[in-house]
From Swiss-Prot:
Taxonomic source organism: Fowlpox virus (strain NVSL)
Alphabetical list of InterPro entries matching this protein: Poxvirus_A31 (IPR008786)
Family assignment from sequence similarity: Belongs to the poxviruses A31 family.
Protein name: Protein FPV195
Taxonomic lineage: Viruses, Varidnaviria, Bamfordvirae, Nucleocytoviricota, Pokkesviricetes
Length: 113
C-alpha cells in the first residue's frame, strides 16, 4: 500500500513530502499485523492520550494497528513506534513499521517534555 511504503521511506531519510492520511479508514495487512490508516478525530486522540498519561506533544498518529489481537492507536514518537490501547496501556512496538511487534510496556511518566 502506498501509505505504508511512504511511512517506511520516511524512516530512512526525510524527504519533506508530508504523508496525507485518508479520512476514511484504509486497511492494510503486513506480516500478520493489521494497519488501519486514517486521520483520527482530535477527540479520539485526546481520549487515548489522556488514559496513557502521555505528556508529550510532538508525535504523529497514523491511525490504528492490531498486533496479537490488541488494537492500539499507532503513534510515532522520537523515531519509534508506540501503540496505546483504549485502556491507556502503552506498548513499545519498534523503530521500523516493517518490523513492529509488542516489545514491552512504556511508562510515559518517565518520558516527558
Amino acid at each position: 500500500m502506498e501509505i505504508f511504503e511512504l511511512i517506511s521511506e520516511n524512516e530512512k531519510y526525510f524527504n519533506g513530502i508530508p504523508i496525507i492520511l485518508p479520512k476514511k479508514k484504509k486497511t492494510y495487512v503486513y506480516k500478520n499485523i493489521t494497519f488501519i490508516f486514517y486521520i483520527p478525530s482530535d477527540n479520539k486522540i485526546e481520549q487515548y492520550i489522556q488514559r496513557s498519561e502521555l505528556h508529550y506533544s510532538d508525535f504523529i498518529v497514523y491511525g490504528k494497528v492490531i498486533i496479537d489481537d490488541v488494537e492500539m492507536l499507532l503513534l510515532y514518537v522520537n523515531f519509534e513506534y508506540y501503540g496505546i490501547s483504549i485502556d491507556g496501556k502503552t506498548k513499545y512496538l519498534g523503530k521500523s513499521i516493517k518490523d513492529l511487534k509488542i516489545r514491552g510496556t512504556k511508562r510515559w511518566k518517565d518520558f516527558t517534555h
